[in-house]
A protein has these predicted regions:
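Extracellular S/T/G-rich loop segment that most often corresponds to the catalytic His/Ser-adjacent loop
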Residues: 6, 142-235
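Active-site catalytic microenvironments for nucleophilic, acid-base chemistry
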Residues: 47-48, 235-239
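Terminal peptide-recognition signature
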Residues: 41, 85, 114, 232, ...
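Substrate-binding/access-modulating region of protease and related hydrolase catalytic domains
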Residues: 59-146, 156-159, 209-228
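Active-site core segment of subtilase-fold serine proteases
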Residues: 1-53, 72, 79-80, 84-85, ...
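Structural detector of well-ordered beta-strand residues that form the stable sheet scaffold
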Residues: 27, 55, 120-122, 148-149, ...
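Solvent-exposed loop/turn segments at secondary-structure junctions
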Residues: 7-11, 50, 60-64, 90-94, ...
């Protein structure tokens, strides 16, 4: 079982009907993925490890989540006996600010709780082109000790220019991008991006532009590299 801590999952998606979805919601009364991010992550996992059991822990309903919900979700996923916890989310905390330093320590404690229960935590490194192994700002949960922290590569295999990096990044996975000419011409090269699932109740502008049917989109980022690692680990553990 992979626990997905994200924006929820579209349980009505035709390709996710066999994944024995269990849903927990920390933000509102709406079970569906209102944002699309979590369904994209589930799509990557399902492509690599079809029909793996997915438990969804909805900690955000837009671009913002909060640390309290994420901490609760990691504890709940541990108590629910997940094998792997996938966190394709992250934030920066300044170690010189007391409240933020306490938040980092809280994340360390819940990560250690999961690891003591033999659960792997796989988390994204972030997309700000930063070295997350140095400086007063800590990236969490990706970047913490005992977390498998995942950066992103382009189609060519080179580290993506947006991907965070550093000595605490454990592995890099293929996650594409807008293409090498995007910064010069502003044109997106769809061939450089990843195709994945999208909520059937939402419209994906990139999916429409690519003439995909409802339920699919193009995307990229360390968020999508992370479930590649989670799914590969799940496939290995199932052998």
């Amino acid at each position: 079982t992979i626990a997905l801590i994200d924006s929820g999952i579209d349980r009505l998606h035709p390709n996710l009907q066999d994944n024995n979805l269990r849903l927990k919601n920390y933000v509102n009364d709406i079970e569906l993925d209102e944002y699309g991010h979590g369904t994209q992550i589930a799509g990557v996992i399902d492509t690599i490890a079809p029909r793996v059991n997915l438990n969804s822990y909805k900690v955000m309903d837009g671009t913002d989540g909060n640390s309290i919900n994420m901490l609760k979700a990691i504890v709940d996923a541990t108590n629910d006996q997940a094998d792997i916890i996938n966190v394709s989310l992250g934030s920066y905390k300044n170690m010189e600010i007391d409240d933020e330093r306490f938040t980092v320590e809280a994340f360390r404690k819940v990560v250690n709780y999961a690891r003591k229960n033999n659960i792997l935590i796989v988390a994204s490194a972030g997309n700000e082109s930063r070295d997350i192994s140095t400086g007063n700002e800590k990236h969490i949960p990706g970047g913490l000790e005992s977390v498998i922290t995942v950066g992103a590569t382009k189609k060519s295999g080179d580290i993506a220019d947006y991907s965070n990096y550093g000595s605490n990044v454990s592995i890099y996975g293929p996650a594409g991008g807008y293409g090498d000419n995007y910064k010069i011409t502003g044109q997106i090269d769809a061939r450089e991006m990843m195709m994945t699932y999208y909520p059937t109740s939402l419209v994906s502008p990139l999916g429409k532009a690519a003439d995909f049917p409802d339920g699919y989109t193009l995307s990229f980022g360390t968020s999508l590299a992370t479930p590649e690692v989670s799914a590969a680990l799940a496939a290995i553990m199932s052998k």
